[in-house]
Amino acid sequence: MGALDTAVRSGRALYAGISNYGGAQTREAARILKALGTPCLIHQPRYNMLDRAPETGGVLDAIGEAGMGCIPFSPLAQGLLTERYLGGIPDGSRATQGKWLDPKAIDAPLRARLTALGAIAKARGQTLAQMALAWVLRDPRITSALIGASRPEQIEDCVRAANAPKFAAAELAAIDKALAA
């Protein structure tokens, strides 16, 4: 935290932020930086429908308590929360590269959960990607979400999530049920 404070004070950075810290670590980082006079303004955790660790591990609570912004990365779970993998692993996809996405993880049970999520998205008038982004952004502690795209139309699709209708309680319950299957 001292290095972050030094970077801000010396003009090398405009603000301090952290990434991938757990709940307790987030609270401690915020406390230390505040004591140094350099508030921690942003946290960047991995967060999506398939990886809810920031909820269960207290990260979102710590962010809210500290008044930090939150910009999650991988809100589409490296493309899993799109329709791309519903029929299997397409040629040229991340899963074929085996670097960041394990093809063995894209099994029939996962595809069934993704298909169920896709049906919920369709009922909302959205693509699965749009719903997944809207789901991440539903929490007021989330400032924005980092997306990646390999084609312009993917960005256009993701941007539409900004105008998504709010989730009804029944929709959130259906999402939780689909994910638990």
Predicted features and spans:
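Beta/alpha (TIM)-barrel catalytic core signal, keyed to glycine-rich beta->alpha loops juxtaposed to Asp/Glu
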Residues: 1-180
